[in-house]
Amino acid sequence: MPRLLIAASGTGGHIYPALSFADSLSNSWEIVWLGVPHRLEVELVPEKYNLIKLKVGGLQGNSFRKLFNLCKLLFASVQVSVLLRQKKINVIFTTGGYISAPSILGAKMAGIPVLLHESNAIPGKVTRLLGRFCDHVALGIPSASEYLQRCRTSFTGTPVRTEFLLEKSLPSWVPLGEGVLIVVMGGSQGAIKMNEMVRKILPCLIEKGCRVVHLTGKNDCFYRNRDQEKNHPNLVVRDFSDEIPALLRNADLAISRSGAGAICELMVTKTPSILIPFPSSTDQHQELNAAYMARFGGAIIVNQHDPEKNILKNIVSNLLDSNSLREMKLNMNNHDYSYPEKKIFEIIHSIS
């Protein structure tokens, strides 16, 4: 049985796509997972896959710290090279993050092929610096290729959990009725300002007969103040839901940040959206992520603004009072974002 090493660490944006891809392989490959101690993968990976932890850090900080971490990176790369030979790894799949750099360099030392996946429209630092040392770079958003001229790239899309691909009925706690269903995903980063914008237009949405599910994120105290929810049966406010696949598959409109994870979930569920990019995202990558969906008419971009302004309110009102939502849904249905896992597997098969 061929052996695949998955190097994914740190945030959900790196780990969840890798987990989704690993799960799609069934039992056809033996999988070894390379991560970092005390990060999210320690909670998510061991119950399914053999996790090997390696100490490595970024190159941030003062000159001494950067030099120290550079030495750790070189040492970790040698460790990875030895590990690859010991485990008889055939190919590496990595999704970025701290662990990607030593994995790519270690693979280069050991002569093992590497497929690097980049989810964002603007590649991260590791992808920009080390993508040229990989056999192939798979892209979640096609415009990222503009920044990777020296790399062999293919647009594959970003893997998502199987639940997003299945038809699902709405959770029982979602308001019933014929009104337009709007799902608001505040996200974990920078959600407070976006939630304030949405909270300001809730009376307008309710007045127009909409059903609203507002997922605020756990870092916002808004979800603790549920006076509005108590006053209207068509509004549900929660900090979090593990039933997002069902919500998006049934939603008429989503209002969301535009991180790579949100983009691929909206794409595979064919959900029209209003995207509010997080203005402090690295390299403003959320703006370009959003531009990808807006370019083919699947989304409208609204920049973060003072809730007292009527920008978001006017855009939502125009959507609800015209055929625009129907046209956006048609655009989403006509845009191909299918089978990312299959496309990635085909590349792995070709380079291994």
Swiss-Prot record:
Pathway: Cell wall biogenesis; peptidoglycan biosynthesis
EC assignment: 2.4.1.227
Classification via InterPro entries: GlcNAc_MurG, Glyco_trans_28_C, GlycoTrans_28_N
Entry GO terms, CC: plasma membrane
Coiled coil segments of this chain: none
Binding site for UDP-N-acetyl-alpha-D-glucosamine: 11-13, 120, 161, 188, 286
Keyword Oxidoreductase: no
GO terms for MF: UDP-N-acetyl-D-glucosamine:N-acetylmuramoyl-L-alanyl-D-glutamyl-meso-2,6-diaminopimelyl-D-alanyl-D-alanine-diphosphoundecaprenol 4-beta-N-acetylglucosaminlytransferase activity; undecaprenyldiphospho-muramoylpentapeptide beta-N-acetylglucosaminyltransferase activity
Subcellular location per the Swiss-Prot or TrEMBL entry: Cell inner membrane
UniProt main location, coarse: membrane
One of the protein's GO biological processes: peptidoglycan biosynthetic process
One Pfam family, short name: Glyco_transf_28
Domain of life: Bacteria
Lipid bilayer topology: Peripheral membrane protein
Catalysed conversion reaction: di-trans,octa-cis-undecaprenyl diphospho-N-acetyl-alpha-D-muramoyl-L-alanyl-D-glutamyl-meso-2,6-diaminopimeloyl-D-alanyl-D-alanine + UDP-N-acetyl-alpha-D-glucosamine = di-trans,octa-cis-undecaprenyl diphospho-[N-acetyl-alpha-D-glucosaminyl-(1->4)]-N-acetyl-alpha-D-muramoyl-L-alanyl-D-glutamyl-meso-2,6-diaminopimeloyl-D-alanyl-D-alanine + UDP + H(+)
Keywords in alphabetical order: Cell cycle, Cell division, Cell inner membrane, Cell membrane, Cell shape, Cell wall biogenesis/degradation, Glycosyltransferase, Membrane, Peptidoglycan synthesis, Transferase
NCBIfam families: murG
Record family assignment: Belongs to the glycosyltransferase 28 family. MurG subfamily.
Function summary: Cell wall formation. Catalyzes the transfer of a GlcNAc subunit on undecaprenyl-pyrophosphoryl-MurNAc-pentapeptide (lipid intermediate I) to form undecaprenyl-pyrophosphoryl-MurNAc-(pentapeptide)GlcNAc (lipid intermediate II).
Protein name: UDP-N-acetylglucosamine--N-acetylmuramyl-(pentapeptide) pyrophosphoryl-undecaprenol N-acetylglucosamine transferase
Organism encoding this protein: Prochlorococcus marinus (strain NATL2A)
Higher taxonomy: Bacteria, Bacillati, Cyanobacteriota, Cyanophyceae, Synechococcales
